[in-house]
């Protein structure tokens, strides 16, 4: 079916989002044009505001509206404890848990030489500077368990060791509420390796 050029432009714009193919993009465009004109205007305004007003925190690389993000600005956060994560979504997951009171360093990806993502693209030079300032006493590695995530964790481990900073890795294994019969062997093996004493 042939669309008006502006409709095609809207559909193509939606396909830049992860997981949105041409059919989903078409449905979204039709929904906005058919019955969501005011919602579409609000979406456009929010997109413009975010594209113009959101930047990366100078300290941790998370999203921010000024030079520092709310976590780095908060004097109640423990600046000696820094959790290394791949994405701002990972920060949100930790924050929603309500258990972590340290700061973060957001890599915005993981090492992947085949994709042209090296240490500089992940801001690891910035992390190295922070480590050498002497204010960080422990890094918590919370990268993924993929090949890229493990390579990134090992690279960061080397930086931390060179700076004399302690390193820990988040536990991995069986999810809360998970049934063992549905857990894959590699995950179960990791859970066994990461076991700890059990007390009441």
From Swiss-Prot:
Keyword line: DNA damage, DNA recombination, DNA repair, Metal-binding, Zinc, Zinc-finger
Source taxon at top rank: Bacteria
Protein's UniProt name: Recombination protein RecR
HAMAP family from the UniProt entry: RecR (MF_00017)
Its biological purpose: May play a role in DNA repair. It seems to be involved in an RecBC-independent recombinational process of DNA repair. It may act with RecF and RecO.
One annotated GO molecular function: DNA binding
PROSITE patterns reported for this sequence: RECR, TOPRIM
Zinc finger motifs (C4-type), residue ranges: 57-72
InterPro entries: DNA_Rcmb_RecR, Rcmb_RecR, Rcmb_RecR_Znf, TOPRIM_dom, TOPRIM_RecR
Organism: Alcanivorax borkumensis (strain ATCC 700651 / DSM 11573 / NCIMB 13689 / SK2)
Domain Toprim, residue spans: 80-175
UniProt family annotation: Belongs to the RecR family.
Record GO biological process: DNA recombination; DNA repair
Pfam families hit by this protein: RecR_C, RecR_HhH, RecR_ZnF, Toprim_4
